[in-house]
């Protein structure tokens, strides 16, 4: 009986039906089987891990399209991540040894890589979150790294993307970042800034030069972060050209105004996109701003189309009778998944960063349990599958 042929046929049949799934709770890359397409386990690369030579790592990962676990690349000597250029899906999982994931709490962590210049995660399409994950894609303290505007757009299609003060390669707009990783405020926004790469925070701000500060706000089109004004003396806050905010502070509302005694005027007349809200549904949450009793028609229409507007201690009808027939489309604005990178969220996570109390008891509690890891095999009886069965039957009869 031709046992070698039978074994070869079984091997091909197995790979055809089930695929090249490899299991390693905390992967030692040099021991990973060849030709893995799916890895069930946690990948750690950097000085804190025992890494084989780069050529071996590249060879072991070149066919990987899906990782069920997490990826941590920290303190590495990589200049790019092209070795993961075929990776399409990362799904967070706590199976096996999860110590590597819990050290950062993210699905994809790329941090403290002093030589890293480019990502080249060109095939990445989907990031699947769970309530255990702090962030989906987390980029921090990679001083030489820049991402393209296209990559930024891809990553902003996901929830829980976090990359404060990221550098942009060959930008077509004026992206403003701070080397000291502070929040933007009334003093440090450069003239002509179109994109803020972190949150705008006016916390206890005194003696604001209103005209000069407003002139800097006029050019801002996007904010990668939130807007927080707390116990400030500012009287007017206008963003005539701001059209998109991606919330890097998920424990705060997108726009948070609290205890500002002089604030009487707010404008968001062009804000039309909030790809990620965070844990609060409110697009604007205001509390204890005694002079802020009215919003313009354009601001009311835009904010109402994005999500709830909450004014504590003021009539909830602050925008009532000031909106036209604009129909709210919150789902569309929140998911932002029209194409490219997609994110599935099982349960929202939390962020340890909080600037102040927002006067609420916290985000609504969600008791949904983590979905257990499962696999679904698609036994499609196509011609190739039948071909192998017929040969197997012929050998044994």
From Swiss-Prot:
Coiled-coil regions listed in the entry: none
Domain of life per record: Eukaryota
SUPFAM superfamilies reported in the protein's UniProt record: L domain-like
Pfam families: Recep_L_domain
Protein name, UniProt field: Protein irld-34
Record organism: Caenorhabditis elegans
Gene coding for it: irld-34
């Amino acid at each position: 009986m031709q046992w070698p042929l039978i074994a070869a046929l079984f091997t091909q049949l197995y790979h055809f039906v089930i695929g090249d799934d490899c299991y390693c709770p905390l992967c030692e890359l040099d021991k990973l089987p060849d030709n893995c397409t799916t890895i069930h386990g946690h990948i750690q690369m950097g000085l804190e891990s025992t890494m084989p030579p780069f050529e071996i790592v590249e060879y072991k990962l070149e066919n990987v399209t899906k990782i069920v676990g997490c990826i941590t690349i920290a303190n590495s000597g990589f200049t790019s991540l092209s070795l993961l250029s075929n990776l399409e899906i990362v799904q967070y999982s706590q199976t096996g040894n999860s110590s590597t994931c819990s050290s950062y709490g993210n699905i994809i962590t790329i941090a403290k890589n002093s030589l890293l210049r480019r990502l080249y995660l060109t095939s990445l399409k989907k990031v699947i979150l769970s309530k255990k994950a702090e962030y989906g894609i987390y980029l921090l303290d990679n001083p030489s790294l820049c991402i393209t505007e296209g990559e930024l757009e891809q990553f902003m299609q996901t929830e829980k993307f976090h990359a404060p003060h990221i550098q942009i390669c060959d930008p077509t707009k004026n992206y403003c970042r701070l080397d000291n990783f502070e929040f933007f405020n009334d003093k440090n926004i450069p003239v002509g800034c179109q994109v803020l790469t972190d949150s705008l925070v006016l916390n206890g701000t005194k003696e604001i030069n209103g005209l000069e500060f407003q002139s800097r706000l006029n050019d801002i089109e996007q904010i990668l972060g939130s807007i927080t004004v707390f116990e400030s003396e500012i009287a007017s806050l206008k963003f005539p050209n701001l059209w998109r905010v991606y919330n890097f502070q998920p424990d705060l509302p997108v726009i948070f105004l609290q205890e500002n005694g002089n604030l009487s005027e707010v404008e968001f007349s062009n804000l039309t996109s909030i790809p990620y809200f965070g844990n609060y549904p409110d697009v604007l949450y205001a509390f204890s701003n005694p002079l802020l009793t009215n919003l313009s028609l354009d601001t009311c229409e835009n904010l109402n189309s994005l999500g709830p507007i909450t004014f504590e201690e003021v009539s909830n009808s602050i925008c009532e009778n000031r909106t036209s027939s604009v129909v709210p489309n919150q789902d569309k604005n929140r998911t932002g998944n029209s194409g490219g990178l997609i994110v599935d969220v099982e349960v929202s996570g939390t962020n340890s960063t909080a600037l102040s109390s927002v006067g609420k008891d916290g985000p609504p509690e969600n008791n949904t349990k983590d979905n257990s890891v499962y696999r679904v095999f698609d036994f499609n009886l196509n011609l190739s599958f039948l071909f192998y069965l017929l040969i197997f039957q012929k050998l044994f009869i």
